[in-house]
């Protein structure tokens, strides 16, 4: 739920499960950020919502994503389009979670390859953002974009930006 459906509630629950409190989880996040050498990032909110002391750069996010994609379980979640949860009494068929990336894409295909996965984001100050992974001409690319026009209720300009960049990569690397 934290990645596919972009659920802030899932992030808060995960933080409490891992560290006991959201504040303790933030301490872990900032410690890991330092260990990874993310010099322009500081986390002050586990959901990613706006907070004056919560900031990063596209470079740092790309470095973080690159490290995370090296973990098999994260790679699997990040590149999943839909996932159905285990059935419960309240939801006998489970709950289908869909990646927020794919609601903005008609096709995953781009020249020479395809978009494998991504995580969307939005705050008023950061605009529409996207961290994505594509494979083009047998090579993988990470792209992080920010400050795209629009909001959660408009066209996905952050996704359009990524598709355009990936198309150019595909055309130039044939």
PLM region spans:
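Penicillin-recognizing serine hydrolase domain
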Residues: 20-174
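Substrate-binding clefts and substrate-entry loops adjacent to catalytic sites
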Residues: 4-17, 44
């Amino acid at each position: 739920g934290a990645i596919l459906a972009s659920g802030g509630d899932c992030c808060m629950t995960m933080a409490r499960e891992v560290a006991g409190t959201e504040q303790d989880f933030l301490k872990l996040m900032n410690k890991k950020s330092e260990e990874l050498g993310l010099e322009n990032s500081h986390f002050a909110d586990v959901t990613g919502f706006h907070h004056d002391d919560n900031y990063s750069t596209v470079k740092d996010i790309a470095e973080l994503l690159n490290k995370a994609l090296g973990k098999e379980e994260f790679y699997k979640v990040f590149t999943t389009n839909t996932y159905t949860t285990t059935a419960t009494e309240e939801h006998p068929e489970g709950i289908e979670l869909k990646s927020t990336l794919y609601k903005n894409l008609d096709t995953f295909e781009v020249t020479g390859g395809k978009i494998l996965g991504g995580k969307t984001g939005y705050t008023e100050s950061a605009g529409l953002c996207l961290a994505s992974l594509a494979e083009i001409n047998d090579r993988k690319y990470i792209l992080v974009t920010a400050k795209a026009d629009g909001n959660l209720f408009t066209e996905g300009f952050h996704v359009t930006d990524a598709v355009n960049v990936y198309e150019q990569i595909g055309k130039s690397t044939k």
